[in-house]
């Protein structure tokens, strides 16, 4: 992959998937660039966890929705999303018990457990994204180095042009999918 600059980390309290809308399209929760960098912004954020939604409502200037992934977003955004960022759990079910105690004891399981291989929610987001993205719109999802090849494949199978961005400094891997 290519190096990238990651200027923001997901917000504290972020659970499950976070979404938002920029300029006519969508971008995500705490990982979204600041509005000044984007010009006019219409921001939408969503989460299935009520505590995360309450936190977002206190901290996000924009629309905050409660619900499961795309089901939480207004239908009027379909096909208009320019940037979509999802903060989905990617820890495989069998490895959740190996996480540090502070994560296991203070985060809901839904914020940690990504399914058998850790990619269940990533696949759901990738499959749903093409219906919401505008042509040329991009989906961004963080994953692990080990899961990156399968995550890129999931984006490709969903019809997105996939690439991988890596930051050695932050030990972060982000799959980027662009709608043709």
Residue ranges and their predicted role:
Residues 1-98:
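Conserved SAM/SAH cofactor-binding pocket of Class I
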Residues 41, 74, 105, 136, ...:
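Short, solvent-exposed coil/turn segments
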Residues 45, 74, 111-118, 144:
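Alpha-helix initiation/capping motif
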Residues 88-120:
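Mobile active-site "lid"/loop adjacent to the S-adenosyl-L-methionine
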Residues 116-177:
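Conserved Class I SAM-dependent methyltransferase catalytic core
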């Amino acid at each position: 992959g290519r190096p990238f600059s990651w200027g923001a980390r997901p917000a504290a309290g972020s659970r499950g998937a976070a979404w938002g809308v920029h300029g006519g399209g969508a971008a995500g929760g705490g990982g979204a660039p600041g509005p000044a960098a984007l010009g006019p912004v219409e921001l939408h954020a969503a989460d299935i966890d009520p505590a995360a939604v309450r936190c977002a409502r206190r901290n996000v200037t924009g629309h905050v929705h409660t619900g499961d992934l795309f089901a939480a977003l207004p239908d009027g955004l379909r096909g208009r999303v320019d940037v979509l960022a999802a903060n989905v759990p990617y820890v495989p079910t069998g490895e959740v018990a190996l996480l540090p105690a502070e994560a296991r004891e203070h985060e809901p399981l839904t914020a940690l457990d990504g399914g058998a291989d850790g990619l269940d929610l990533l696949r759901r987001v990738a499959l749903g994204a093409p219906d919401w993205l505008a042509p040329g719109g991009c989906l961004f999802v963080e994953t692990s180095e080990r899961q990156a090849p399968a995550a890129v494949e999931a984006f490709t199978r969903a019809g997105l042009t996939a690439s991988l961005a890596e930051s050695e400094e932050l030990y972060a891997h982000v799959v980027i999918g662009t709608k043709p």
